[in-house]
From Swiss-Prot:
Reactions catalysed: agmatine + H2O = N-carbamoylputrescine + NH4(+)
Location of the active site: C357
Enzyme class: hydrolase
Any GO BP: putrescine biosynthetic process from arginine
Enzyme Commission number, as recorded: 3.5.3.12
Alphabetical list of PANTHER family matching this protein: AGMATINE DEIMINASE-RELATED
Keywords: Hydrolase, Polyamine biosynthesis
Gene3D superfamilies in the cross-refs: L-arginine/glycine Amidinotransferase, Chain A
Protein name: Agmatine deiminase
Amino acid sequence: MTTLNSTPRADGFHMPAEWAPQTQVWMVWPERPDNWRLGGKPAQAAHVAIAKAIARFEPVTVAVSAAQYDNARARLDMPNIRVVEMSSNDAWVRDSGPTFVINDRGELRGVNWEFNAWGGFDGGLYAPWNLDSQVGSKVLEIERCPRYATQGFVLEGGSIHVDGEGTLITTEECLLNRNRNPHLTREQIEAVLSDYLAVDKIIWLPDGLFNDETDGHVDNFCCYIRPGEVLLAWTDDPEDPNYPRCHAALSILENTRDAQGRAFIVHKMPIPGPLFATEEECAGVDQVHGSQERNPSVRLAGSYVNFLIVNGGIIAPSFDDPMDEKAREILQKLFPEHEVVMAPGRELLLGGGNIHCLTQQQPAPFKA
């Protein structure tokens, strides 16, 4: 694998929007018993459902440990799903995996960020994370894809959304957190994002969703649906702790323009719940020092915004919640050219994330 000493912007590469054509989606098999209950078996069943839903639209590659390879291969019994052996600490490939960039000559490259399990030893969710920190480079190695190294810059893919036309949305809660890149100022962080993703304007929302243990990833709160239009998690309940977060984000979005000078159209997505884990669900998680504790009194950061756009499809989470059907209707209205598939999201939420967090799209390069 070639490691490049330049930057994507300098070489004419950029991160495309999620709705751009894709060649495949990457996933990593869940099995960590101190994060996934009952040794990961319920989460694996949800993983299979999601992988098969995606595979209806495009190929899927699932990275699996040697110990779980036979089990995963047997369950992922579709021709469009490839299973490869890869060591990892957990399954969050949106955050541990690479960010792919393309140019207008049909070339694909990858950006390899530093991963510290959402905070390292200052609020991180587990240790060690050394295997996860290798996932990005291993994915690029498998794809024979040249790699940009970011010299220790900590970033998770779930903390950013781009429109492919020069604008990036993120949250201060995450990117300015002291446990990510405390040695860098906001301006220095913006410069890195500009160089490695080729964005010209960065929109900073104050916070993500309440109790999001990633420190407020934007992909669980606000996402692009097309250039100039975003979908924002929303509540009208003043007693909901998400209420001030939603309104603060809306104020920012309504009073700014994107890199192309467009005012934002903001669509609202109701927040499910409030959702909580049961005592039985929490009891099924191994208790290990240094790993995130699961507690039935702590509200879960459930969100329908945590969906994945694939070629011709939208794969979105359902929570056995009365709001599920409303969420599906909203997504179908916003994406009339796509088929909306609701997939089981509760087991993923119990582990700390959802469909977008557990997937990483690989764009299809094209010649202009």
